[in-house]
Amino acid sequence: MISQQSAKHIENQWLALEIGNSRLHWALFMGESLEFTWDTEYLPESVIQQLGNGETKLEVGSEEKEIFFTFFPLPPAPCPLPLFIASVVPQQTVLWENYLNVRVITLDQIPLNNIYPTLGIDRALALWGAGMSWGFPVLVIDAGTALTFTAADGGKNLVGGAILPGVGLQFASLGQQTGQLPQVEMEAIKSLPPRFALNTTEAIQSGVIYTLIAGMRDFTEEWLSLFPDGKVAIKGGDRILLLNYLQALYPDLAARLIVEPNLIFWGMQTIVAGVA
């Protein structure tokens, strides 16, 4: 039997799901409050069906995994929490269409001006979340599978941005698409490599890291020259790694960056508040 207090918690709860290029990123909200976040690998269709039935202890292979335990009681089946999705992987989006209480957030729901049709929903939501949290104008750096720069001016107009391979993707492409270059693992890099390296592994590290940091510096300085009072926020799985390198090389510039991994979720929250 669910108490009135628990029922109130349940009524205000909803899930946000960002379907990224390599993983699923989750958030549990209590109304407008972000309670906590977690990541999972892509889930099998059978597990998605269990979630859609309101189950929280999921059978994944031979193991029972409590993927969706929370600090608040979850509703019993068949009443799954409302689920709002932002996806950059259409094949994954389709798998969630049978979830009983799902809404997919689309570009036309984001109140940015000058959006072009192929702008990634992740970039748009992160930009909107940053602007609504810290104000416009704002530049968002997303250090994920791709390293992206996305900016909006004080009138909430999309200024534009840029996309390039992220640090892991650059290492992987050199290791996989060349005949003799080794695969460099990011975990093996403990500090900045020598800029002029005397072995192949460190030469790859130097080339990738210093050019990425130079790109971050160039885009950030150009942005701040256009909008001296503008904000710069960084998110993404490699944010700490790249921010540490930027701090070591350009500490004054690094100090201008706002580190916030949940920009997309904050963007989703403002959209959900308007449609729920």
Swiss-Prot record:
Top-level EC class: transferase
Residues noted as binding ATP in the record, renumbered to the chain: 18-25, 145
Family matches, as Pfam families: Pan_kinase
Binding-site residues for K(+), renumbered to this chain: 142
EC number(s) from the headed UniProt entry: 2.7.1.33
Binding site for substrate: 116, 120-123, 200
Primary residence: cytoplasm
Positions of disulphide bridges: none
Coiled-coil stretches noted in the UniProt entry, renumbered to this chain: none
Any one GO CC term of the record: cytoplasm
Catalytic activity of the protein: (R)-pantothenate + ATP = (R)-4'-phosphopantothenate + ADP + H(+)
Location relative to the cell: Cytoplasm
Pathway the protein contributes to: Cofactor biosynthesis; coenzyme A biosynthesis; CoA from (R)-pantothenate: step 1/5
Any one Gene Ontology molecular-function term assigned to this protein's record: metal ion binding
InterPro entries given in the database record: ATPase_NBD, Type_III_PanK
The keyword Metal-binding belongs to this UniProt entry's keyword annotation: yes
Cofactor, free-text remark: A monovalent cation. Ammonium or potassium.
GO biological process terms on file: coenzyme A biosynthetic process
Record key words, sorted: ATP-binding, Coenzyme A biosynthesis, Cytoplasm, Kinase, Metal-binding, Nucleotide-binding, Potassium, Transferase
NCBIfam families according to UniProt: baf, PRK13331.1
PANTHER family per the UniProt record, alphabetical: TYPE III PANTOTHENATE KINASE
Function, as annotated: Catalyzes the phosphorylation of pantothenate (Pan), the first step in CoA biosynthesis.
Subunit record text: Homodimer.
Family: Belongs to the type III pantothenate kinase family.
HAMAP family documented for this protein: Pantothen_kinase_3
Protein name stated in the entry: Type III pantothenate kinase
Gene: coaX
